[in-house]
């Protein structure tokens, strides 16, 4: 696994910081905090935050002013100078760390991890090391915010300076199955210099731990608890089916695929065809030693009209105890 920054990376960043007369001159400088940070600050109490590639320091200072204990990490000394100076001017403090994220030893989990455009500037051979560090840094109930450029059309060049453009499905696949998308936003920039490949879509990801991956038994129990809450005896139907697939009354053939896809339980980070859903659930359950056929049947009955229609075409979220579900993100 390659971890050391390449000559191209170092040359590009050192040249840019040597050229800049102030933090405002940096091509990646921004006045407003990265999208999603304000909402995160409203939703949760301040904790430990890690700003990977802090750059001009805008996000580090914003979070520190909101009461967060901020670690500002960058391998460029001048980036840390800008960040600390802006923190002093704002009357707050941050913890500067001069290090390369791909080589840094993560000291503790963080409640919030932020990357405002570092990943898309890294050499792809270092991506596995980056991924490993991010997964180590995000706490079990933590949030990860990522800014990354997307191509505006298939095959769009990245330009001599980059950044590298990567589509949404590839980004989600890169962090799957450990992390899953909570929210997504995008901005369109139709015309930029050829040096950076012209226009781009600037994408923002708010990711969290995928508890269907890390806590599979908890998910199964939450489904069972929902049946109990609604006074539905699901065990009789499971016992009757045994090792055979159940055949309940369904409103649509794709309901199991919708249930376990990215819009609900998140067993898969991409949409599934109806024919693939049963096998995916059984594989997932087998890896978790949960009884593949029984779990697949349980999830199928969860979508069935004749077993409460709990998570069918119109899910009854108000009657549901499944917290490991994307539809519950506002609840």
Say what each PLM segment does.
Residues 2-44, 48-50, 56-108, 122-133, ...:
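Class I (Rossmann-like) S-adenosyl-L-methionine-dependent methyltransferase catalytic domain
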